[in-house]
Amino acid sequence: MEQLSAANTRFAVDLFLTLTEHNPAGNIFISPFSISSALAMVFLGARGDTAAQMSKALHFEGVEIHSGFQSLNADINKCGAPYTLKLANRLFGEKSYDFLPEFLASTQEMYSAELASVDFLRAPEDARKTINAWVKEQTGGKIPELLASGMVDSLTKLVLVNAIYFKGKWQEKFMVEATKDAPFRLNKKETKTVKMMYQKKKFPFGYIKDLKCRVLELPYEGKDLSMVILLPDDIQDEATGLKKIEQQLTLEKLREWTRPESLDLLEVRVQLPRFKLEESYDLQEPLARLGVRDLFSSKADLSGMSGAKDLFISKVVHKSVVDVNEEGTEAAAATGAIAEFAMLVPEEEFVADHPFIFFIRHKPSSNILFLGRLSSP
C-alpha cells in the first residue's frame, strides 16, 4: 500500500505541475487519487505499448496496483467515518462492442465498477444524459453536468467517468461571526474583497526556511483527513508568488515539509478565505504530455478489455468542486493522541490573504485525495 501511495503522490505532483504550465496564474483543483484510480481500471485492460506508457506515467512499475487500490478504496470509504467520501468509477462503452467477461469481472471485483453499455452510435445525446445523471447521483448533486453538449458523438466508443465526493467538518470550526470582509492580494498589483474566516487554536504548523513558506495543517473530525496549506510569506514573482514552491514540488519534498517532525503543535492565528472552486479538465492533453499517448488514438491496445482492435478511450473528463467554509469542506470531483501541556505557547500568524497551494490528504495511507492552487477565491 505504501508503494501505491508513493506512486499516486508522484503522479499527483506530475499532473499538477503539467496543469500549472498551461495555467500559470489561475485556480487549479483536481482529485489526483480518483484520476489514478480510474486510469488503473483502464490499465487492467491495457496491453503492449499502451500499458507500458500508462505504467510509466502513473509510476506503477513494480507496484501491486489492483489489489492495492481495492484495499485503499475500502480504507478510505470506510463505514462509520465522521466524513463522507464517496469514490465512484464507471466505464461507459458502446453497446455494439463485446467486452471480455474476465475484464468485467475484474473491474467489478477490484474497483466495484460496472461497465455500462450505452448507444453512442445511434443516440449519443441520450448516452450523454445517462452519464450525467449517474455522475449527479454519485456526487450528491454537486456535479450535475460532467459532459457538456457535444462532448460525445456517434464515433465515441468508450468514456471513462470518475467522481469523488467529499464532505468533512473541521475538528476546530471557524466561528461564523468572526468572518469579515478583507482584501485578498491576487498578485503584486491587484486585490479583491473576500470573506475572511478567523480562529486562534493549536494546529500543526511548520516553516520552510529556504522557500520562506508557512505550512499549516487543519484536521477534519476524526483526524484521518486533513487539509495542508503551503503559504509563501509574500508574493515574490510576477504571477501568484507560488513559482518557487511549484519548482521544488516532488514526492520527497512534500513528505519532508509535512511530516509530523517538521510540524509543531502551536497556537496559530489563522485567517483563511471562504472559497469555492469548480474546475473542469479534459485530461487527454495533460496525460499525453506525461507520456500516455496511444490510449486516445487508434494505436491503443486495449485487447484485455475487448477482442476488438479499434477500441480506444475517447474522453477522460475530470470535474472537481470544493467548498471551504466555517464548518468544513465539501468537495466533489468527478476524477495518536497528543499530550497537551499548560504553558505559554508562542503564537504564530497564518494570514492566507494571497495565493496558496493546498491539499487534502488521507493520513493513514498518505494519499493526496485533492490538490489545488487558490489564486483567486
Swiss-Prot record:
A Gene Ontology term for the protein's cellular component: early endosome
Does the keyword field hold Acetylation?
yes
Q: Where in the cell is it found?
A: Secreted; Cytoplasm; Cytolytic granule; Early endosome
**Domain of life where this protein originates:** Eukaryota
Q: Which GO terms describe its molecular function?
A: serine-type endopeptidase inhibitor activity
Q: Transmembrane segments in this chain: where?
A: none
Subunit text: Monomer. Interacts (via C-terminus) with CASP1; CASP4 (via CARD domain) and CASP5; these interactions regulate the activity of inflammatory caspases. Interacts with PRTN3. Interacts with GZMH.
Q: What is this protein called?
A: Leukocyte elastase inhibitor
Q: Which organism is it from?
A: Bos taurus (Bovine)
Gene name per UniProt = SERPINB1
